[in-house]
Amino acid sequence: MIQKNWQELIKPNKLHVEPGADPQRTAIVVAEPLERGFGMTLGNSLRRVLLSSLQGAAVTAIQIDGVLHEFSSIPGVREDVTDIILNIKTLGLRMHGEGPKRMHLRAVGPGEVTAGLIEVGHDIEIMDPELVLCTLDEGAKLNIEFTVETGKGYVPASQNRPEDSPIGLIPIDAIFSPVRKVAYKVENTRVGQVTDYDKLSMTVETNGAVTPDDAVALAARILQDQLQLFINFEEPTAVVEEEKKDELPFNKNLLRKVDELELSVRSANCLKNDNIIYIGDLVQKTEAEMLRTPNFGRKSLNEIKEVLAQMGLHLGMEIANWPPENIEELAKKLEEPY
């Protein structure tokens, strides 16, 4: 059946997020297990989208009282205009709604001028209020008007100059992406006795306008939308599969035989000697009962617990009406392809 192309591939059960020192800005996002090679495929694709395609807000132009171009200096300001612009380019912003919007800065020396002094409307948030923009000497004054817009990726200053721009408007390079850094690594992970599945760990740092896990979710949604075009068939119906699931009042894995679990020889022999045939027989045993089995030790116990956990099962389960009267017939149906 066509759906086997994707249904029989192993997939992560859920995404694990390890928050950094500042959970709003840094985190490690972990996905496992993945088919071999998928870690690199997904990691590289997500990284490129994260760095290039997420929407964000940035300053696209400024006007400074008494300044005509970016190569000027301002009396009483220790930094020249070029240095001030470099600092403004690193300013993290969150904007609610569409732009362009305006922000204003009015400062009097002496002292450092930080982003927290910028006057903003209700629809703009400054993510780095402690960012130092410049330093003023005694008696120095500084007035700046900022133009803020939304966009994606990197847009050079040459594209941020409107045709009817007034004299003194200085366009600047805009870094719209809320994602600052992305790194990923792929390691081996184990499922049962198979040890060559992929584990993808992505370290994501943002400017605070979006959380790292939300950024990854947005990147995945972008990829999903772009790839949808390449699917040239309709999703096959799963009516037969659903009917079969409805026939069973319990997890269908309970009908599998324990010799399908690819256990070590010692563990498999212990189960066979104890007349444990189906997984349904196995999960009803407690840990204490298993350890009383001849030649069955703690190592074998841990191996079985790990394999059962991959199927959402565990030892010590209570299963009503087990075994079913037609267990062999049900087990045979389970082996048949849909």
Swiss-Prot record:
Chain positions covered by the region annotation Alpha N-terminal domain (alpha-NTD): 1-234
Entry keyword annotation includes Nucleotide-binding: no
Annotated protein name in UniProt: DNA-directed RNA polymerase subunit alpha
Domain notes: The N-terminal domain is essential for RNAP assembly and basal transcription, whereas the C-terminal domain is involved in interaction with transcriptional regulators and with upstream promoter elements.
Alpha C-terminal domain (alpha-CTD): annotated segments: 250-338
Record keywords: DNA-directed RNA polymerase, Nucleotidyltransferase, Transcription, Transferase
GO cellular component, one term: cytoplasm
Protein function: DNA-dependent RNA polymerase catalyzes the transcription of DNA into RNA using the four ribonucleoside triphosphates as substrates.
Cysteine disulfide links: none
Species classification: Bacteria, Pseudomonadati, Pseudomonadota, Alphaproteobacteria, Rhodospirillales
EC number: 2.7.7.6
Family statement: Belongs to the RNA polymerase alpha chain family.
Quaternary state and interactors: Homodimer. The RNAP catalytic core consists of 2 alpha, 1 beta, 1 beta' and 1 omega subunit. When a sigma factor is associated with the core the holoenzyme is formed, which can initiate transcription.
Name of the gene this protein is made from: rpoA
Signal sequence interval, chain numbering: none
One MF annotation (Gene Ontology) recorded for this entry: DNA-directed RNA polymerase activity
EC main group: transferase
Species this chain originates from: Paramagnetospirillum magneticum (strain ATCC 700264 / AMB-1) (Magnetospirillum magneticum)
UniProt-listed Pfam families: RNA_pol_A_bac, RNA_pol_A_CTD, RNA_pol_L
